[in-house]
Amino acid sequence: MSRDLPSLNALRAFEAAARLHSISLAAEELHVTHGAVSRQVRLLEDDLGVALFGKDGRGVKLTDSGVRLRDACGDAFERLRGVCAELRRQTAEAPFVLGVPGSLLARWFIPRLDQLNRALPDLRLQLSTSEGEFDPRRPGLDAMLWFAEPPWPADMQVFELAPERMGPVVSPRLAQETGLAQAPAARLLQEPLLHTASRPQAWPAWAASQGLAAEALRYGQGFEHLYYLLEAAVAGLGVAIAPEPLVRDDLAAGRLAAPWGFIETDARLALWVPARLHDPRAGRLAQWLREQLAG
């Protein structure tokens, strides 16, 4: 123990007993036993080498040394309470800056943003796009949404939200015109497949899951971002592949179809938070995201 400052637990126990003029009331306030408070006070007296309490007929009585320490502790704890309250207010009032890949932001997050604002009104969410740039440690970010595979780095608090599910999607019109709606997965080896540079392994991984040779795939039009890839699929330009959340609303609205379903990959959609931030809003956001993704 440092000789400069006694145990903070002991000081806290003493301050409560001195302020309330009662060991029992101090124990009740601190949610510990009478004996625990008494032991902490004795440890403090031993450490300081002075008696802090005496006895009178009605309970504990402060000695002169006890009065001095009570006043010092009262001032110190009051200042601490004030600073902590101010820090909590700053956290509550500051926006929570969340990095989201642009495609996920446009196709899944923004359509649910009003629900989020109503569910977590204290979040004060500020969104930042991060297409193609995975850097959860970027200055100014409080958290980032991203698909990635474990293990997770030690300096990040990672909230796993949902497994990544990938699958081919096509416009219903094109599926009917070409017979793709009822075709087996192997039929896609005959189609020029829409693809994106941001997900170069998506088609090969899907082909392997279907027992198909990746080298037999035929690639058609390429796009820089998933968002444009999916717009092309909606327009009937070919078959695309994407994570399920990005096409969930399109499937529900009939703009896209997924005749071959979705496969689960090794990746997870996760909320990445630098461990040093300790912002409780991250946990509340993660829980809301889990519920939405599971729906």
UniProtKB/Swiss-Prot annotation:
Gene3D superfamilies: Periplasmic binding protein-like II, Winged helix-like DNA-binding domain superfamily/Winged helix DNA-binding domain
Any one annotated GO CC term: protein-DNA complex
Gene Ontology process terms (BP): DNA-templated transcription; L-tryptophan biosynthetic process; positive regulation of amino acid biosynthetic process; regulation of DNA-templated transcription
Result when mutating V170L: In strain: PAC174
Signal peptide: none
HTH lysR-type domain residues: 6-63
DNA-binding region listed in the record: 23-42
CDD domains linked to this entry: PBP2_TrpI
Gene Ontology molecular functions: DNA-binding transcription factor activity; sequence-specific DNA binding
Alphabetic keyword roster: Activator, Amino-acid biosynthesis, Aromatic amino acid biosynthesis, DNA-binding, Repressor, Transcription, Transcription regulation, Tryptophan biosynthesis
Effect of P163S: In strain: PAC174
A Pfam family assignment: HTH_1
Effect recorded for A181S: In strain: PAC174
Induction, as annotated: Negatively autoregulated.
PROSITE patterns linked to this entry: HTH_LYSR (PS50931)
Keyword Transcription: yes
Keyword Magnesium: no
Miscellaneous comment in the UniProt entry for this protein: The trpAB promoter and the trpI promoter overlap, so that RNA polymerase cannot form open complexes with both promoters simultaneously.
Family: Belongs to the LysR transcriptional regulatory family.
Protein name, per record: HTH-type transcriptional regulator TrpI
Name of the coding gene: trpI
